[in-house]
UniProtKB/Swiss-Prot annotation:
One of its GO terms (cellular component) is nucleus. GO terms for biological process: brain development; camera-type eye morphogenesis; negative regulation of transcription by RNA polymerase II; neuron differentiation. The keyword Nucleus applies. It comes from Eublepharis macularius (Leopard gecko). The lineage of its organism: Eukaryota, Metazoa, Chordata, Craniata, Vertebrata. Residues 1-68 bind DNA. SUPFAM superfamilies: HMG-box. This is SRY-related protein LG28.
């Protein structure tokens, strides 16, 4: 069972692709840093759609109440 994505992960999935299209040689660590900075600059109102999508996590928790994340 996969771990559900939080709002940042939902948002960053698409944003990561955009960055990789523009700068295909950029290292993943640098992309992640940029994504983190950009997420912090977003207004709460801009994050709402991603927070709602991440609410799937609640359904996941209801469907799998004994789930424990193990990296």
């Amino acid at each position: 069972v996969k771990r559900p994505m939080n709002a940042f992960m939902v948002w960053s999935q698409n944003e990561r692709r955009k960055i990789m299209d523009q700068w295909p040689d950029m290292h993943n660590a640098e992309i992640s840093k940029r994504l983190g900075r950009r997420w912090q600059l977003l207004q709460d109102s801009e994050k709402i759609p991603f927070v709602k999508e991440a609410s799937v996590r609640l359904k996941h928790m209801a469907d799998y109440p004994d789930y424990k994340y193990r990296p």
